[in-house]
Design a protein with these regions (language model features):
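Conserved beta-loop-beta/alpha segment of the NTase-like Rossmann-fold superfamily
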Residues: 59-62, 69-166
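Conserved FAD/dinucleotide-binding core of flavoprotein oxidoreductases
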Residues: 170-171
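N-terminal glycine-rich phosphate-binding loop and ensuing alpha1 helix
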Residues: 1-69, 84, 89-91, 125-130
């Protein structure tokens, strides 16, 4: 509801941040971290996410015909960021855990990452890649978290952490 009326007809994941939808930043981070298979758990009315990452042959023909090669490359690269799978969440939505569980058959026994494009991480080495490296080094699950104020504690999931010898890693 924070982004209404902008999200009445468009998913918040598709709201633009500079020149591309917010969700594309997350997908680019996943791709830059070496992951090719991406599963989107979507809800009713979010077909624009699928359309965005699908190839667009008609648009490509128009751009090619107009000699707009830079835009053509951007459009093509978007659909080449990974192999995309889409699962529609059942109604009513039953929370994040249920949404993740819906991808179980596609994920199988593989390691996986859950990204929510609510925050965009701007790191020289992608945040997800750093998390993968920590997970492999520690042989453990890894969460990216941030400090929040009292208001945020009412709106977000909260974790209690203990420091370790690495200032970037808490237990």
């Amino acid at each position: 509801t924070r982004f209404l009326p902008a999200t009445k007809a468009q998913p918040k994941e598709m709201l633009p941040l500079v020149d591309k939808p917010i969700i594309q930043y997350a997908v680019e981070e996943v791709a830059a971290s070496g992951i090719r298979k991406m599963v989107f758990i979507t809800a009713q009315g979010k077909h624009s996410i699928e359309n965005h990452f699908d190839s667009a042959s008609e648009l490509e023909k128009v751009l090619e015909g107009k000699g707009k090669t830079e835009l053509l490359d951007k459009v093509r690269k978007t659909s080449e960021l990974g192999k995309f799978f889409y699962v529609r969440q059942q109604q009513p939505p039953l929370g994040l855990g249920h949404a993740v569980l819906m991808a179980k058959e596609l994920v199988s026994d593989d390691y996986f990452a859950v990204l929510l494009p609510d925050d965009v991480m701007d790191c020289q080495t992608p945040c997800l890649k750093q998390m993968i490296e920590v997970g492999e080094k520690k042989d453990a699950a890894v969460l990216a978290v941030q400090k929040t104020d009292e208001d945020g504690q009412k709106r977000y999931g909260i974790v209690k952490v203990e420091p370790t010898d690495d200032p970037r890693i808490s237990k």
